[in-house]
């Protein structure tokens, strides 16, 4: 038996074990264990179906090769073997993809955070432009976008936008967007026609629940204050704004979009959990990177991943040396698959 066949046999064995366990009274009465084993079985269901079919094809190939010795059946066996070899090749391609380790966060919703960096007002304007492109992409994928928090600047741009994006495969498609995005263009306010370079950071944080990350209440510093508007003027006469700081990591989240202090606190806590989970992911990726041939990117906010050059209509994805001369079309249509698909393909190739 080949190494691949042995691996697939072990997967099928585990699938059958899980089927038996999930029907046992002990597991049925243990909600935590039931959920855990159900998730495991679901994660290997697709590869199990393909494995069963592949092993069946191998058995049929073996039987037909034996029939080649039979004069009456040899021609029929030859024809059957041609079909079986094609099927075997197709299944091997499918199985190869299915054996790539699945990111446990791929099916999660995300918090998308865009923040203006260097470049002043122009950086803030690009935060808005890129956010619109993500919203158009979400429409194409039939995802739901909900702005959780936003902070505008004085020229129609944004200092920061945080949005919750819900839908199938959101994290799997957008996780490679994390990092620093650089834009080169002539600002509308530039009378001399000079090209300005500015940058914004993008963070992609999986939405998490209390089971996945727990926070000790004693590790939190919670402050309340009055919400401020443009120019620092007060827009609320009550202390409805909330700032929560996780003392061990010094990660802080402020929220003032809601009139209710309770709602602001709830939103801030959810984003704080997402940021702490994101930190865990980054640390794990750094540890795993030592075992990889190469990484698409760490997801670190400081990593410059992409340049948007408007005068040349050029989008450059630095991690995989991809250059596209259709920047304006991509931004207006939201068809980010032109960039995302090559990034995913590159990431998958690292497991081959």
From Swiss-Prot:
Which residues get modified to N5-methylglutamine? 233
Q: Which GO terms describe its molecular function?
A: translation release factor activity, codon specific
Segments of skewed composition (Basic and acidic residues): 289-306
Cellular component per GO?
cytoplasm
Q: Which Pfam families match?
A: PCRF, RF-1
Keywords noted in UniProt: Cytoplasm, Methylation, Protein biosynthesis
Cell location = Cytoplasm
Q: Which Gene3D superfamilies match?
A: 3.30.160.20, 3.30.70.1660, 6.10.140.1950
Q: What is its main location?
A: cytoplasm
Q: Does the keyword Heme feature in the UniProt annotation? A: no
Q: Which domain of life is it from?
A: Bacteria
Summarize what the UniProt record says about post-translational modification.
Methylated by PrmC. Methylation increases the termination efficiency of RF1.
**UniProt-annotated stretches for the region Disordered:** 288-309
Family, as annotated: Belongs to the prokaryotic/mitochondrial release factor family.
Its job? Peptide chain release factor 1 directs the termination of translation in response to the peptide chain termination codons UAG and UAA.
Protein's recorded name: Peptide chain release factor 1
């Amino acid at each position: 038996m080949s190494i691949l066949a042995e691996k697939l046999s072990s997967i099928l064995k585990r699938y059958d074990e899980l089927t038996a366990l999930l029907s046992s009274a002990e597991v049925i009465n243990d909600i935590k264990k039931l959920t855990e084993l159900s998730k495991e079985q679901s994660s290997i269901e697709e590869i199990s179906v393909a494995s069963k079919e592949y092993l069946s094809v191998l058995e049929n190939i073996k039987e037909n090769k034996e029939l080649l010795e039979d004069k009456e059946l040899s021609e029929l066996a030859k024809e059957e073997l041609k079909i079986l070899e094609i099927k075997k090749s197709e299944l091997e391609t499918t199985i190869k993809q299915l054996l790539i380790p699945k990111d446990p966060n791929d099916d999660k919703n995300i918090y998308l955070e865009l923040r203006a960096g260097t470049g002043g007002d122009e950086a803030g304007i690009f935060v808005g432009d890129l956010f619109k492109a993500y919203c158009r992409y979400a429409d194409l994928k039939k995802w739901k976008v909900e702005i959780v928090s936003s902070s505008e600047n004085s020229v129609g741009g944004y200092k920061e936008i945080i949005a919750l994006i819900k839908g199938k495969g959101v994290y799997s498609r957008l996780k490679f967007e994390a990092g620093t995005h650089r834009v080169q263009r002539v600002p509308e306010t530039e009378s001399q026609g000079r090209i300005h370079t500015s940058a914004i950071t993008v963070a992609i944080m999986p939405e998490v629940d209390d089971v996945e990350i727990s926070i000790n209440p004693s590790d939190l510093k919670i402050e309340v204050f009055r919400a401020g508007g443009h120019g620092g003027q007060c827009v609320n006469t009550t202390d409805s704004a909330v700032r929560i700081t996780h003392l061990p990591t010094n990660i802080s989240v402020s929220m003032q979009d809601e009139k209710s202090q309770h709602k602001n606190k709830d939103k801030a806590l959810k984003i704080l959990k997402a940021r702490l989970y994101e930190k865990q992911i980054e640390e794990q990726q750094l540890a795993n990177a030592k075992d990889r041939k190469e990484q698409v990117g760490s997801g670190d906010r400081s990593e410059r991943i992409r340049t948007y050059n408007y005068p040349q209509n050029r989008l450059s994805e630095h991690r995989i040396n991809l250059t596209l001369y259709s920047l304006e079309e991509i931004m207006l249509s939201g068809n980010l698959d032109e960039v995302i698909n090559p990034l995913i393909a590159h990431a998958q190739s690292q497991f081959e």
